[in-house]
């Protein structure tokens, strides 16, 4: 059992991305689904699919690359966990970070659900910074 399931998901995606895997399987949860939905909407992954295994389920994530077969590069250059179980990071509306000068996204868990930094600024809500993706 992992102490931080979201960090485990991000690590699995980062590792699969670095060896150019087509897909990666992750134990499912609603928070992970919300994070993957944002990553899909922002164009960092191709798609994800829920597979019912009779227990908690599995999320199969289809990764996205740019370039031809020979010089393939991951679309997602980096992904890091910000708020950890030992050190939670909360921000208000004025302190929502911009990732890589606006080229990346910060994913936040707010009172209105999981959303990107841009959406949180528009809705004027703060929350817990889950991760940065660029």
From Swiss-Prot:
BP GO annotations: translation
Ribonucleoprotein recorded as keyword: yes
Name recorded for this polypeptide: Small ribosomal subunit protein uS8
Record HAMAP family: Ribosomal_uS8_B
Keywords: Ribonucleoprotein, Ribosomal protein, RNA-binding, rRNA-binding
Gene: rpsH
Domain of life: Bacteria
InterPro entries with a match to the protein in the record: Ribosomal_uS8 (IPR000630), Ribosomal_uS8_CS (IPR047863), Ribosomal_uS8_sf (IPR035987)
Function: One of the primary rRNA binding proteins, it binds directly to 16S rRNA central domain where it helps coordinate assembly of the platform of the 30S subunit.
Signal peptide positions on this chain: none
One Pfam match: Ribosomal_S8
Source species of the chain: Petrotoga mobilis (strain DSM 10674 / SJ95)
Lineage: Bacteria, Thermotogati, Thermotogota, Thermotogae, Petrotogales
Record GO cellular component, one term: ribosome
Statement: the UniProt record of this protein carries the keyword Hydrolase: no
Subunit and partners: Part of the 30S ribosomal subunit. Contacts proteins S5 and S12.
């Amino acid at each position: 059992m992992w102490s931080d399931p979201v960090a485990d998901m991000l690590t699995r995606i980062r590792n699969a991305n670095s060896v150019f895997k087509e897909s990666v399987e992750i134990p499912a949860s609603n928070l992970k689904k919300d994070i993957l939905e944002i990553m899909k909407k922002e164009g960092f992954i191709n798609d994800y699919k829920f597979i019912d295994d009779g227990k908690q389920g599995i999320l199969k994530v289809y990764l996205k690359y740019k370039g031809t077969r020979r010089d393939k590069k991951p679309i997602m250059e980096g992904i890091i966990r910000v708020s950890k179980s030992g050190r939670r990071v909360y921000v208000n509306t004025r302190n929502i970070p911009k990732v890589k000068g606006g080229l990346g996204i910060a994913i936040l868990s707010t009172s209105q659900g999981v959303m990107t930094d841009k959406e949180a600024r528009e809705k004027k809500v703060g929350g817990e910074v889950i991760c940065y993706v660029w």
